[in-house]
């Protein structure tokens, strides 16, 4: 259209709008004008390109060649040759790296007269082809998801990543209906067997990409789901009639075509119902669909009214290449109606044969031009009219974002399917009643699945290789038959039905045998079709894929960290049918995620690492564990440094620290709160009511409440051990070997006379009450130990373990860890040269507690950060955790609240200091609802109900000398607490 006429037309249309358009239609028509303006501009650009291209250059636009970014310069030279001599229209990238691909794309685009359309075959994202990029779940996994909005979000994110690396088209989604369990090529690339589910999910994935600047390509038309062979190696045959094809295979394509999908890829299939012509004598097979005009033009373009890009499947695949030579094959694909020739074997031969076909009149130049215009319109649509070189700076970080990782986690979480839960075992509850073992079949070492299970319960772990002998499997039965529950993970499976998906007969026999002695839960990290092997199991989960993410999430799901909602996308048997899956409740235990999951940018938490490393470098502590949880999710859990300054043993997350005075809230408080709820104590009761031996002393009338808030007037502490340091006294009181008299272990190979406990209590009884106001004191907690043991009719440590810690599922919360754990897991607390004359390792650091055998109300408890966080989460939940109520909400609120204006204390619990004149043990940014405690060895635990936040810091700042006060003077614990609140504020995640 001449420019003058275009100007007049546009001016007339604008005047019409000004003088005629009603107000209520103005917005609608304005949008239409914008759309028309876009079409005009697109047409202008397309026609400009057509005018400057020669007929040969137009032919070149039909080719999309294969490119790699992991090959040498010879490959790049070959691609540049195709660009410069055959004017190819695009390329599809396969294996390589994102940086090299971006660099190559920039060079290729610069060398091309017409912008290149860059594609990738990335069904599950860039990670399907490129190293060091993220892999999204495969489509069969996605088929189990019930919320299709998540697939739209996935499409959005994959499009973002594609654009960042210079890709404009993704050859996805696969919308084949997988109604053949023996399909060797589609299988887990399909959303499943239900056409409606396939269509809905295909649309969601497609629209997410298309709305964000990347063209989708629906494949493999007219449907590759019901085949028994792979078109990469042969021509598969589908013998369904036309009614079946229209009802099943074609349905998803019809739906995506109605949603204007940009591309459709035609498969190499033999479908006599669609085209029964013989491919060529003497071959008896019917025409491959890619080369069939009846399929491509008559069915897809005319009957189904598809106007987008029609793309062949790769032309080097044996499904077509075995019938025709390069060049001839490409011409036949064009004659069938395809627009883009994908992965031609020989561009030069194809180019020449197409020219010959035009010259002979087999195909007209106008037909070529029509397809080229369609290709150019697509290029304009994705912004190639204004191509800008890809910026390679920070490319890896831009691709592999935390938000993308979070989305992948959400997808997998939503897919995991609880196929059977007949005994209502999942999520696991009442852990105190269970003895649990785990078995990974198909693994040689402890799996990520098993490691994550460790965070929820005490579990004994076992492994078996799939190749192990029947005898080895039988021996494993002997190891496991005594457990009440066995969790079995099936790993390294395959998709071959003929090989029973990689599950050995011995594994099935072992599972069936164990079922008779234990409650067995099987988690299949692989094909849902393999479920047919487990018809007799009551508890069965399928995670679809075997990777670190599915393993970590499956372990959390079993223990109720999040709800299970997935449904089977295919039928494995009449019992395990499409759509089957049980729903569970979630959020009953801690979940393990990333900061972005709770609205915090992980970058803002990075100063924690710097503070911790500097503290270690400055000699404030040899090492530490730091944990942050928000909204019931652990979002930061790291260990730093070593057990000692000798750098001999690095700190691991599972290592165990002496909690010191955190014992008050993590042990004694629990017992007293239970006694309070059961009416066994009142806050204004006196000690004398429970301890008649105090009659006549100044301790008898001390009120429980006053001791809890440190206002009973007691001395801060009494160094009982100092009276035993004299050599003569020491010889009378200690032995290096335990016997019936010297039975109190105060350190390794050092035992105190058991009757010396009476001396300790007598000393406390006769001590003065010098203080009339607030004074922090340990002494009352010696008496609380006696009270609780009398109440429970057992030792304090046994009571706490049986009533609380075992129920919570903690592994490391305990007194005297030297009895249960290897010293390599226990962090030493001091090199005591004064009293114990040894490294204090696995024994309580506090001298008073040590002289009571390591169990007391004020000190003696050990833990790692995770188990302490579990306990704090129970309190943050107002007394509820793991499906069990430990305390009434009112009890927790009473004990954790401020008690009066004399101090910042709650009942046992410490609180933020409201008076700015005094030092604050917690962050000044913490809400006044926050509660917790610090510990002498360099520990703290804080929970903030207002922000649903938990902060744990464990260290051994007392090693090698308890006089080291650098941790406190540098305010390390509080600085880290500050960073957490600052991160929430900066992220607006509060």
Label each PLM-derived region with a short phrase.
Residues 5-12, 16-82, 292-293, 323-597, ...:
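Preference for extracellular/luminal or secreted protein segments
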Residues 54, 101-116, 126-128, 193-367, ...:
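Second-shell residues forming the walls of enzyme active-site clefts
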Residues 89, 262, 375, 616-650, ...:
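A short, well-structured edge-of-sheet supersecondary motif
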Residues 98-117, 146-164, 368, 373, ...:
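Active-site-adjacent structural elements in enzyme catalytic domains
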Residues 618-625, 646-709, 767-780, 856-859:
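Short active-site loop at a secondary-structure junction
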Residues 700-928:
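Short, surface-exposed loop or secondary-structure junction motifs
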């Amino acid at each position: 259209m001449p420019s003058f006429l275009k100007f007049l037309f546009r001016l007339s249309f604008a005047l019409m709008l000004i003088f005629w358009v009603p107000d209520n239609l103005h917005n609608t028509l304005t949008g239409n004008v914008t759309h028309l303006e876009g079409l005009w501009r697109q047409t202008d650009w397309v026609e400009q390109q057509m005018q400057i291209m020669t007929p040969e250059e137009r032919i070149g636009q039909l080719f999309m060649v294969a490119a790699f970014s992991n090959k040498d310069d010879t490959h790049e030279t070959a691609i540049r040759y195709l660009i410069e001599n055959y004017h190819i229209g695009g390329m599809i990238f396969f294996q390589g790296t994102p940086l090299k691909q971006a660099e190559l794309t920039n060079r290729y685009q610069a060398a091309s007269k017409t912008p290149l359309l860059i594609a990738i075959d990335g069904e599950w994202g860039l990670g399907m082809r490129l190293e060091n990029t993220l892999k999204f779940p495969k489509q069969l996994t996605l088929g189990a998801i019930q919320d299709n909005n998540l697939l739209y979000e996935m499409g959005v994110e994959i499009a973002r990543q594609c654009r960042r690396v210079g890709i404009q088209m993704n050859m996805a989604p696969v919308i084949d209906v997988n109604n053949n369990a023996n399909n060797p090529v589609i299988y887990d690339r399909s959303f499943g067997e239900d056409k409606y589910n396939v269509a809905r999910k295909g649309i969601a994935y497609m629209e997410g990409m298309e709305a964000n600047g990347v063209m989708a390509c629906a494949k493999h038309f007219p449907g590759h789901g019901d085949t028994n062979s792979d078109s990469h190696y042969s021509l598969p045959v589908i013998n369904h009639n036309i009614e079946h094809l229209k009802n099943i295979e074609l349905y998803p394509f019809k739906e995506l075509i109605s949603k204007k999908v940009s591309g459709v890829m035609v498969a190499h299939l033999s479908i006599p119902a669609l085209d029964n012509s013989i491919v060529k004598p003497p071959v008896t097979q019917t025409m491959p669909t890619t080369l069939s005009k009846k399929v491509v033009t008559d069915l897809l373009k005319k009957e189904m009214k598809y106007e987008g890009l029609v793309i062949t499947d790769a032309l080097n695949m044996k499904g077509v290449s075995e019938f025709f030579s390069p060049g001839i094959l490409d011409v036949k694909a064009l004659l069938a109606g395809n627009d883009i020739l994908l992965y031609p074997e020989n561009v030069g031969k194809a180019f020449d044969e197409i020219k010959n076909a035009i010259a002979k009149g087999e195909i007209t130049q106008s037909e070529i031009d029509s397809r080229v215009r369609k290709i150019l319109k697509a290029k304009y649509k994705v912004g190639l009219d204004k191509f800008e070189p890809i910026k390679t700076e920070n490319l890896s970080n831009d691709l592999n974002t935390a938000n993308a990782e979070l989305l992948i986690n959400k997808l997998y979480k939503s897919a995991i399917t609880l196929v059977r839960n007949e005994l209502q075992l999942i999520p696991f509850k009442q852990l105190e009643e269970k003895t649990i073992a785990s078995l990974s079949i198909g693994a040689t070492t402890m799996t990520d699945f098993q490691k994550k299970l460790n965070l929820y319960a005490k579990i004994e772990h076992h492994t078996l290789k799939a190749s192990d002998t029947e005898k080895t499997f039988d021996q494993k039965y002997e190891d496991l038959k005594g457990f009440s529950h066995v969790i079995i993970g099936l790993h390294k499976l395959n998709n071959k039905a003929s090989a029973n998906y990689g599950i050995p007969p011995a594994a099935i026999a072992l599972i069936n045998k164990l079922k008779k002695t234990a409650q067995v839960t099987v988690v299949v990290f692989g094909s849902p079709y393999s479920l047919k092997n487990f018809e007799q199991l009551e508890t069965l989960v399928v995670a679809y894929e075997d990777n670190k993410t599915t393993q970590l999430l499956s372990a959390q799901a079993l223990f109720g960290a999040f709800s299970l909602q997935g449904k089977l996308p295919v039928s494995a048997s009449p019992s395990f049918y499409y759509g089957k899956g049980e729903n569970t409740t979630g959020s009953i235990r801690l979940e393990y995620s990333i900061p972005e999951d709770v609205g915090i940018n992980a970058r803002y938490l990075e100063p924690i690492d710097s503070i911790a490393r500097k503290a270690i470098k400055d000699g404030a502590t040899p090492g530490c564990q730091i944990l942050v949880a928000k909204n019931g999710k652990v979002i930061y859990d790291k260990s730093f440094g070593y057990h000692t300054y000798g750098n001999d043993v690095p700190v691991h997350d599972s290592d165990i620290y002496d909690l010191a005075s955190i014992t008050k809230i993590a042990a004694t408080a629990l017992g007293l709160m239970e006694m309070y709820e059961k009416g066994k104590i009142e806050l204004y009761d006196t000690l004398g009511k429970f301890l008649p031996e105090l009659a006549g002393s100044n301790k008898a009338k001390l009120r429980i409440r006053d001791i809890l808030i440190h206002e009973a007037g007691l001395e801060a502490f009494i160094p009982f051990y100092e009276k035993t340091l004299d050599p003569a006294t020491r010889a009378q009181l200690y032995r290096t070997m335990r016997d019936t008299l010297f039975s109190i272990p105060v350190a390794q190979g050092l035992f105190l006379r058991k009757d010396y406990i009476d001396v300790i209590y007598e000393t406390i009884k006769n001590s003065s009450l010098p203080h009339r106001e607030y004074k922090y004191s340990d002494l009352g907690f010696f008496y609380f130990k006696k009270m609780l043991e009398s109440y429970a009719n057992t030792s304090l440590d046994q009571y706490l373990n049986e009533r609380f810690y075992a129920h919570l599922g903690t592994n490391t919360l305990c007194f005297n860890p030297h009895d249960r754990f290897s010293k390599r897991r226990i962090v030493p607390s001091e090199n005591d040269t004064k009293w114990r004359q040894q490294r204090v390792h696995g024994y309580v650091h506090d001298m008073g507690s040590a002289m009571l055998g390591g169990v007391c109300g004020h000190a003696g408890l050990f833990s790692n950060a995770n188990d302490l966080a579990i306990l704090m989460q129970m309190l943050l939940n107002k007394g509820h955790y793991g499906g069990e109520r430990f305390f009434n909400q009112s009890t927790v609120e009473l004990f954790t609240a401020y008690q009066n204006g004399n101090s910042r204390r709650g009942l046992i619990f410490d609180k933020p200091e409201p008076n700015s004149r005094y030092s604050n043990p917690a962050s000044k940014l913490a809400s006044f609802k926050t509660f917790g405690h610090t510990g002498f060895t360099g520990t703290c635990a804080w929970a903030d109900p207002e922000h649903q936040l938990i902060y744990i810091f464990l260290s051994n700042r007392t090693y090698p000398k308890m006089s080291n006060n650098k941790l406190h003077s540098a305010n390390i614990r509080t600085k880290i607490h500050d960073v957490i609140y600052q991160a929430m504020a900066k992220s607006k995640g509060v």
